[in-house]
Amino acid sequence: MSFRLCLIGVVVTVAYSVGVPALTVAIDWPQFRGRDAGVAANNPRLPSAWDSTRNVVWTTEIPGVGWSSPIVSGDHVFVTSVVAASDTDPKPKPGFYNGGAVTTTSTAEHRWVVYDVALATGKIRWQRELRRALPQLPKHQKNSYASETPVTDGTRVYALFGGVGLFALNFEGQVLWSKEFADVKFRNGWGGAASPVLHRGRLYVVCDNDDQSFVAAFDAETGRELWKVNRKEGTNWSSPFVWENDQRSELITTGSDKVRSYDLNGTLLWEFAGMSTITIPTPFARHGLLFISSGYVADQLRPTYAIKPGASGDISLAPGTTTNAYVAWSHPTIAPYNPTPLVYGDYLYTLLDRGFFTAHDARTGREIYGRQRIAPDASGFTSSPWVYNDKIFVLSEDGDTYVLQPGSEFKVLGKNSLGEMTLATPAVSEDSLIIRTASKLYRISEPESPR
């Protein structure tokens, strides 16, 4: 495998007539949904209103196709993409396919690429080609070969491509190490999407597939495999989560067969059954509880669980029950299919793919309000919600971001349109919102107030 650093021409548009504002120390967004599960630090310059030109600091065209989310470290915005030699693959479209999607293996040569974009200017510093080949695996029309979000520790960036491998690069674009992964079969040929997670010098990777699923840990500095455990699971698309609770640190993995917790050396701690047949949302923690959702739209069982720390063995619910010693509460039908829910303040907010929004008490599961339609004309939602400045934001597949009021009353406060499809969850860095659409990366921020 050869590695090449390629410099290309890019389109960068600076939208402030006064020029790009000087950067101060950035608050990093190092992984999918940031450090705090979608909750960003407040900043008066974080935007609540925008369109394709309003409050846009810059836009940068990103070649190829990728639905991985952007991540931010200092002045570096990292995204991944896969660039095809010819534009012959079926185009994704917003909304639900209901079995009408095309699943194909491309016959064109592809390049798997990591991009480093300057947060201050929007210019691409470098792009690193990690692989050039014909794709060996099919994918769903709506998926991409670059749907796994990278992760960074502020020194290195780690990129995972399903069926290709795991790569570590420094901030100059040099490949420090790589681990090739064998081709595996994903359910219905839909491709992969589970992102890696980084914790105290270790990278954790889950690869649930229809051949042999596994979870593994790698040394972040050297790439050495520390351990690998096979899993009795079929294909899932949920990323792992390291839960640091008041008793221990544990690696949480969800699956359509079981939710499993491992210690950080790969020993199984506890597990439970009772998920939908496809699992996508990422686990996260708040208020001392672990939140797990699994909501495949075709299933009757679409559960959300709140788990207490300290469990061991099988903690599956008995038939007809919703709680036990370690399940603080559960609900059988409130989970989303793609988006990961959000806990802000006392409430668990759930964005459903078909454009409904719900709120429940995060500690008890009590319904605050049931399904509320966000907009009658929205095509669907895949991106996960985020919050700052006491406003919740949800991004539709059409590229429309709806601004919602948090609290006990549902209210839509505004709508911001970029006019292009997106599935990626945005990043937030200090005073800026970073949104990835099908072809572009946007930095959006309120102008600095005149002194």
Question: Where do the model's predicted regions map?
Answer:
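N-terminal secretory signal peptides that target proteins for export/translocation
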Residues: 1-5
